[in-house]
Amino acid sequence: MKVFYVTAECWPFAKTGGLGDVSYALPKELKKEGVDVRVIMPKYSTIPSYLKDQLKEIAVFSVRVGWRNQYCGLLEMELDGVKFYFIDNEFYFRREDERKSIYGYGDDAERYTFFTDAVLEAISRIDFYPDVIHINDWHTGMLPLILKERYATLEGYKNIKTMYTIHNLQYQGVFDKHVLYDILDLPQKYFDNGDIEYYGSINFMKAGINFADKIITVSPTYANEIQTSFYGEQLDGLLRKESGKLKGILNGIDYDLNDPAKDKDIFVHYDVDSINKKVENKLRLQDILGLKKDSSIPLIGIVSRLVSQKGFDLIAYMMPELMREDLQIVVLGTGEHQYQSMFNYYDSNFSDKVSARITFNASLAQQIYAASDMFLMPSLFEPCGIGQMLAMRYGSLPIVRETGGLRDTVTPYNKFTGEGNGFSFKNYNAHEMFFCLKNAIKVFKDKEKWIKLVENAMKTDNSWKKSAKEYIETYRDICD
């Protein structure tokens, strides 16, 4: 099985969100399972120097973008047994603000159309004709259509299948209609028949949904949710129409990078057989953050983008009530000004209960996972979610709303059987969240029950191994 994995970002080269994590971890696991997988992405100027120094140029060619030809360099390197290729063009992938974000530029449609065309041209240059091209999110959504329109009759290309993973339906790549002629150079019929048209504009994600052989979302529940008007972002009708090729496969987490038994960022190592050592991380973090050192006070962790999607409206509404409870909250993240200001206020005025770090610090994130007793994720919607899986890996019990991947990964505590690996509530309601949290605190005070739940959480298999096997099975299905 040969798979060409096409992504706009991949850790450790360039990462803005979960796509970057998946693009590193999934191919690595696929390789372990015997798949000949190769990854291709843009060569951004922000790739760390120690990695840039390892890149080797293997080809130079021109790529046609609309009416013009553009230079394209092709470079390669190997990391963790996986071969990575990089599409080089400084006009598109060297930006002054790239350190802040690799996306969000006025010419993004042109940048990622160039990237898509370059990927298809690169296939013959590296003599790697895959069984499946696996594309991700809106940036590469046009690839199946361009493959069909320009390459379908070429030797080596005609039997290639495409799989399209939607990591977040909210970001669709919607651009002005002129993109069709000036950049994509595609026939008018694809706009007129609605295949890529979206309220008078061009929609890259819609193209991917229509023309890919298989559509994947990052959890089974999210695959169902996006077929409804509430979650469907105005593509729910199309997704219902294409439901026969839609499937949800949960993301995993990298168990090598996230292991409390050997994580270099945490204070004290522990595993499921030495859970009693976890509390040392809590006491150390309380001390560092200026919170009262007390193992009996439940410590609630939040590591997240501070945006409305993540349920911070609910938290903001209940903060006055939460401040009356015997608990501590540690927050790490950046995002919308209103939530940053809210957490800064409580950090200043309730410093014995709240510590807010309005930044992102990877080491501190790991320390919060290891130190916290509970991990709060009351998301409005959550395609998959990584935080709850990392929390379970480190023995911090997730408190989540039952949506998307949160519903698929967190089994709520059953007080009659003692089963479960976290706590959950159903409706997007602040008081439901609050009562769920209070229930978790009540169970926390019963150490025997709590330790059993922590053991359940740490034994939950959220590794990429399970997910990779599902992907391989799906690759085979579309190739048969």
Curated annotation (Swiss-Prot):
Pfam families: Glyco_transf_5 (PF08323), Glycos_transf_1 (PF00534). ADP-alpha-D-glucose binds at K15. Its EC number is 2.4.1.21. Synthesizes alpha-1,4-glucan chains using ADP-glucose. It is an enzyme of class 2 (transferase). GO terms for molecular function: alpha-1,4-glucan glucosyltransferase (ADP-glucose donor) activity; alpha-1,4-glucan glucosyltransferase (UDP-glucose donor) activity. Keywords: Glycogen biosynthesis, Glycosyltransferase, Transferase. InterPro entries: Glyco_trans_1, GS/SS, Starch_synth_cat_dom. Pathway: Glycan biosynthesis; glycogen biosynthesis. Belongs to the glycosyltransferase 1 family. Bacterial/plant glycogen synthase subfamily. This is Glycogen synthase. One of its GO terms (biological process) is glycogen biosynthetic process. CDD domains: GT5_Glycogen_synthase_DULL1-like. It catalyses: [(1->4)-alpha-D-glucosyl](n) + ADP-alpha-D-glucose = [(1->4)-alpha-D-glucosyl](n+1) + ADP + H(+).
